Amino acid sequence: MSAKNDNVSTRGFFMTTDQPIDVAIIGGGPAGYAAAIYAARANLTTTVIEQGMSGGQIATTNEVENYPGIPLLSGAELGERFQQHAEGLGAQVTWSMVTGIDYDADAALFTVHHDMGDTLASSVIACMGATPRPAGFAGEDTYRGLSL
């Protein structure tokens, strides 16, 4: 565990501080958590801001059978493992919807505005993922989370 980061998950609560963090990551999918893991390992104060659930789109999948090293688990479980990995290295997770970002060139700081307050950060990584498009065939919803 890094000396700079505390193993903290806000789980819906956000502790405001006037002190900027090193990295704010918008999005808690695989890319967001991969970024958080690398940033925390580099001893950077790191916060993942996610509006939904850990894992992003993969969390809606019933069964994941093609993740290397793990034969079978649910998408929600995989998302939870992403979160636990990042938190175990010191990243903080905040459950909130980002509403905007401002940059102050004089201070060289970003302000990430979200439902739980503002986060000041030296850098921002946007990992906002994708939204699946419906294919448009009859009965499509029946297969959602299984093979679509």
Residue ranges and their predicted role:
Residues 2-26, 42, 47, 93-148:
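FAD-binding core/adjacent interface of flavoenzyme oxidoreductases
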Residues 27-30, 51:
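Glycine-rich Rossmann-fold phosphate-binding loop(s) that bind the pyrophosphate
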Residues 30-35, 145:
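Short glycine/serine/threonine-rich phosphate/pyrophosphate-binding segments
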Residues 36, 40:
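Gly/Ala-rich phosphate-binding loop of Rossmann-like dinucleotide-binding domains
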Residues 41-60:
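Glycine-rich FAD pyrophosphate-binding loop
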Residues 56, 65, 133:
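Glycine-centered loop/turn positions within well-structured domains
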Residues 59-118:
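N-terminal Rossmann-like dinucleotide/flavin-binding domain of flavoprotein oxidoreductases
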